[in-house]
Amino acid sequence: MNKIMIVEDSEDIRGLLQNYLEKYGYQTVVAADFTAVLDVFLREKPDVVLLDINLPAYDGYYWCRQIRQHSTSPIIFISARSGEMDQVMAIENGGDDYIEKPFSYDIVLAKIKSQIRRAYGEYAAKQGEKVVEYAGVQLFVERFELRFQDEKSELSKKESKLLEVLLERGEKVTSRDRLMEKTWDTDIFIDDNTLNVYITRLRKKLRELNAPVSIEAVRGEGYQLRAQS
């Protein structure tokens, strides 16, 4: 069952969207605290986000940019703004589609289905998309998405870069310096503890997926992956 996150400050519209989508078999989650939209997204991991532009505290463009730092999940803007520039800004800030209010619920449903097909279904993993795999664990590089069997986990851009290097190397040891160079790609000094934090996060996400892979530290050398039997 696909999960749809609704970020809409009108209780009436929010309720109608929930009822309509649930009638067609979707699970819905609502962001009611408009200062914590990203927190809800990271906790609930929705497949599609319906996002209004005119919101209390921060607008929809802001939240779209915040989400894009962590995920490539489809984001559909739903707004009363009908100007061409509003639609341009929605796309430039990371949105995938735009629906004007007032809207047809059938159109909303059709666009959700289209985005799900594109991101996860028959149009997913298009030719040329990079997928790195080790011991059954798959990383969809462009999506920052980690998968094992039927479970998935969204990664941040840095987590994805780091795991990409480790998956490509497999059981070969990769030095800490090499991992930091590949992940941060910058001349700015990166504290060793920063790498430790990201390794800890990746270990946690692999455990949550019950993936048969662990990230092992090799004293004085770096890190390697180890397939578990």
Curated annotation (Swiss-Prot):
SMART domains: REC (SM00448), Trans_reg_C (SM00862)
Keyword field: Activator, Cytoplasm, DNA-binding, Phosphoprotein, Transcription, Transcription regulation, Two-component regulatory system
Modified residues annotated as 4-aspartylphosphate in this record: D52
InterPro entries linked: CheY-like_superfamily, OmpR/PhoB-type_DNA-bd, Sig_transdc_resp-reg_C-effctor, Sig_transdc_resp-reg_receiver, WalR-like, WH-like_DNA-bd_sf
DNA-binding region boundaries: 129-227
Gene3D superfamilies in the cross-refs: 3.40.50.2300, 6.10.250.690, Winged helix-like DNA-binding domain superfamily/Winged helix DNA-binding domain
GO molecular function, one term: transcription cis-regulatory region binding
Superkingdom, taxonomy of origin: Bacteria
Any one biological process term the GO annotation gives: regulation of DNA-templated transcription
Location(s), subcellular: Cytoplasm
GO CC entries: cytosol; protein-DNA complex
Processing after translation: Phosphorylated by YxdK.
Role according to the record: Probable member of the two-component regulatory system YxdK/YxdJ. Positively regulates the expression of the yxdLMyxeA operon by direct interaction with its promoter region. Could also indirectly regulate the expression of the dlt operon.
Protein name, per record: Transcriptional regulatory protein YxdJ
